[in-house]
């Protein structure tokens, strides 16, 4: 997997895009408005500057990270070559179902569809698609570039191949993945 799409440039989305881009992935960051995208890129830039100030990143690495991110206001323009799409929109079930239906229609057949939901059933979200075996939860903790934990949530139909790919991807990002079944609140929000 090389080409990542992140839907939503807010707090979680820009952190997810930052993390993938800093790890060397090409990221298409999508939001409904250019203003939201500009705010997201500004936040990523500020966070990268903080990492530089601590001596943990160079200006060249910052430029590479920002160069790995392309912004889009139309989902249809961003998904053509996606290997993984991570949805990080507002925690609203109807909105997520609508987005997943669009993702399913626009993404290549082999693309994995992930959600950053903290509480909505992965099985329910997968029902909006024709590829429930490729739908999975990938719940990052805030602030994403710093927090190591990521919950990998299997829906009823999520395949072992999809789970294994996202579990390993999380390790590549420097995260500590934990396997979670599709229960209300998953792990972090149940505690």
Regions found by a protein language model. Give the residues of each.
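Rossmann-fold dehydrogenase core element
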Residues: 109-115, 126-141, 173-176
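Internal alpha-helical scaffold of NAD(P)-dependent oxidoreductase catalytic cores
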Residues: 131, 152-183
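A non-catalytic, amphipathic alpha-helix used as a structural packing/dimerization or gating element
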Residues: 35-46, 95, 161-172
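Rossmann-like NAD(P)-binding element
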Residues: 35-39, 50-52, 56-113, 119-120
């Amino acid at each position: 997997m090389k080409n990542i799409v992140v839907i939503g440039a807010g707090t979680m989305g820009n952190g997810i895009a930052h993390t993938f881009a800093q790890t060397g992935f090409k990221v298409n960051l999508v939001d409904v408005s250019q203003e939201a995208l500009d705010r997201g890129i500004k936040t990523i830039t500020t966070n990268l500057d903080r990492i530089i100030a601590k001596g943990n990143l160079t200006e060249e690495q910052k430029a590479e990270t920002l160069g790995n991110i392309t912004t889009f206001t139309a989902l249809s323009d961003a998904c053509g070559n996606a290997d993984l799409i991570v949805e990080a929109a507002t925690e609203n079930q109807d909105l997520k179902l609508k987005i997943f239906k669009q993702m399913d229609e626009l993404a290549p057949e082999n693309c994995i569809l992930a959600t950053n939901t903290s509480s909505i059933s992965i099985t329910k979200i997968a029902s909006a698609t024709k590829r429930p075996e490729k739908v999975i939860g990938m719940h990052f903790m805030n602030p994403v570039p710093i927090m190591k934990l990521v919950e990998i949530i299997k829906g009823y139909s999520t395949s072992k191949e999809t789970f294994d790919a996202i579990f390993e991807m999380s390790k590549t990002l420097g995260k500590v993945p934990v396997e979670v079944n599709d229960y209300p609140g998953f792990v972090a929000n149940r505690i």
